[in-house]
Amino acid sequence: MRTFILKANTAVTSPDFSLKDLPGTGGRIDLLCRFLNSAFLLSHGIRKDVRVFMTLYGRPNPPKTIHFEGPKLKVRLNPDERSTALILKKALKIGEDLREPTKEVEVFPGVYVSNMTFEDVVRRVMKDSTLYYLVEDGKPITEIEFPQNPAFVLGDHLGLSKEDERFLEGIAKKVRIGRRSYLASHVVAFVNIWLDGM
């Protein structure tokens, strides 16, 4: 199983965003839609060997974590952002009533919402995965032999904060796909294709 953890610094934590203006009213929730599509979609189906955690830190009640579990996923992911945004909207609606910090509630089969922080998610994932931080100054991906259950941490268009990077020191190995900053959706697609070829 490969895992991707995306920290979304501005993505809203309320379902009150317009499907007609995902970047503006959703705090760039459009990035999450593209990320999910790149993480899971194949030409004729979805990947069952992928798990995604997205931690949202936008207004009004951060954090919220939306978790997609490939082997259990029954919801239909389509290439368009709008239908994926509807899934996120439903998860955030159910997440409004959550009070416990780490309890997950199933929204659809394979889709969960919680109040987990970025740190909570990393700690949970590292119990059964080897962590890698995807960043421009990391070791080239071509030089790394990945274990059975790799987990990749990356940021949105704003990246990770210095505090997040300090938290990852010593627990996540830095790796890069190139020396430039790429879109998160492109990074996850590249990593999936790279691992497919191993």
From Swiss-Prot:
It is found in: Cytoplasm. GO terms for molecular function: S-adenosylmethionine-dependent methyltransferase activity; tRNA methyltransferase activity. GO terms for cellular component: cytoplasm. It is an enzyme of class 2 (transferase). This is tRNA (pseudouridine(54)-N(1))-methyltransferase. Pfam families: Methyltrn_RNA_2. InterPro entries: Alpha/beta_knot_MTases, TrmY, tRNA_m1G_MTases_N. It comes from Thermococcus kodakarensis (strain ATCC BAA-918 / JCM 12380 / KOD1) (Pyrococcus kodakaraensis (strain KOD1)). S-adenosyl-L-methionine binds at L134, G155. It catalyses: pseudouridine(54) in tRNA + S-adenosyl-L-methionine = N(1)-methylpseudouridine(54) in tRNA + S-adenosyl-L-homocysteine + H(+).
